[in-house]
Structure formats: structure tokens, C-alpha cells
């Protein structure tokens, strides 16, 4: 990855339980290393208006109050977590200033380029956001088959109660992104996936 990648993905949402529903649609994400100075395409900007843009205010903390990369670095340092060598942000960009980013991911890699920690920022229609710190219990590199649990502490879907757990899977390859989030509770739950090829972002 030399600059910024574009992921033209498909996302799927399937609700389990008494109220069943599922749908899928195409969605565009970008994957960027905010700690590197890279040459950005003409139609894409960081922290300035453009056709497509990424603002630190949208990521790394509460909506419209984000601190971007610094927020992630402080979390990793405060908890002495691995993965501080390279941190990538996977997120939906703004389009003509409009932002809709229900979930974004901070992917944290070690010196050997192994994925060690992921911070998932999940928002809902009420303007709330919560962050889920994902890593293996022994802090070993995260593999595609690993299922990593985290507790859900507020409503994301109006049809889902606040009790239950999130289970994450991350398959981050040089040519493909494949992420799944499963909400588990007695009598129901929710499955969401994000899958798409990685390609350099160009004009």
C-alpha cells in the first residue's frame, strides 16, 4: 500500500429472531495511513472540502469531535497495546461534505505487518457512538479465522435490546477486505459483513 486504497464493497445486514430481515448494497470505503505523507488524488482531500474527503473530526472519538490518529495512538500507549507501528483507517469518506459513516475501523499493525489490534467505531441513527477494542486474549496477531468478542453497551439497531455481545472477524489482505460483525443474544441477533477488493484510489 503506497498511498490510499479504495474498497468498492458489498455490505450485508441480516437480522435474526422474531423480526427477521436482511438486505445488502454496494458501499465505498477508503483505507488510508494518516501517519504518512502521501500524494492524494485530485478529487480527494484530508481535512479540507472536496468531492471526496476524510476529516479527523469524523473519527477517533465522539461524532464531530474526533481527534483522528492521535486518539488511537493515545489508547494504544495508555494500555501498552501492540500495533503502534502502523495504523490504518478504514472508513467511508465524505461526499461533497456529507458524512454517513455508521462504522469505521482503525487497523493497528506491528513491525512485521501483522494485525494486532482493531478499534471499531460504531454509530447509530441517534448520533451516538461507541468504540470496541478488539484483540486476541494473548495479544497474538489476529488471523482471519479468529472470532473476537466485545460487549455491546448501547442501541445501534432500534430492534435490538442493549444486552448481548458483539463478535468480530477480520480478514485484511493486500487485495481484499473481509470483515464481519455478529451481534449475539438469546433468541436473536444481527449479522453484518463488509467485503470488497482493495485497489489504489485514483481519479
Features from the language model and the residues they span:
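Mature, function-bearing regions of proteins
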Residues: 1-203
Amino acid at each position: 500500500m503506497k498511498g490510499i486504497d479504495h474498497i468498492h464493497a458489498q455490505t450485508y445486514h441480516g437480522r435474526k429472531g422474531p423480526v427477521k430481515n436482511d438486505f445488502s448494497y454496494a458501499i465505498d470505503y477508503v483505507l488510508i495511513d494518516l501517519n504518512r505523507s502521501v500524494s492524494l488524488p485530485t478529487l480527494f482531500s484530508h481535512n479540507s472540502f472536496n468531492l471526496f474527503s476524510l476529516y479527523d473530526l469524523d473519527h477517533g472519538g465522539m461524532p464531530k469531535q474526533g481527534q483522528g490518529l492521535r486518539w488511537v495512538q493515545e489508547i494504544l500507549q495508555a494500555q501498552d497495546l501492540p500495533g503502534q507501528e502502523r495504523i490504518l483507517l478504514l472508513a467511508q469518506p465524505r461526499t461533497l461534505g456529507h458524512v454517513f459513516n455508521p462504522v469505521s475501523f482503525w487497523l493497528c499493525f506491528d513491525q512485521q505487518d501483522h494485525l494486532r489490534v482493531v478499534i471499531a467505531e460504531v454509530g447509530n441513527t441517534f448520533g451516538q457512538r461507541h468504540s470496541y477494542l478488539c484483540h486476541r486474549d494473548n495479544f497474538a496477531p489476529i488471523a482471519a479465522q479468529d472470532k473476537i468478542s466485545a460487549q455491546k453497551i448501547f442501541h445501534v439497531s432500534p430492534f435490538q435490546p442493549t444486552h448481548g455481545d458483539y463478535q468480530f472477524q477480520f480478514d485484511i489482505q493486500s487485495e481484499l477486505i473481509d470483515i464481519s460483525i455478529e451481534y449475539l443474544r438469546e433468541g436473536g441477533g444481527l449479522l453484518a459483513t463488509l467485503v470488497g477488493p482493495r485497489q489504489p484510489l485514483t481519479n
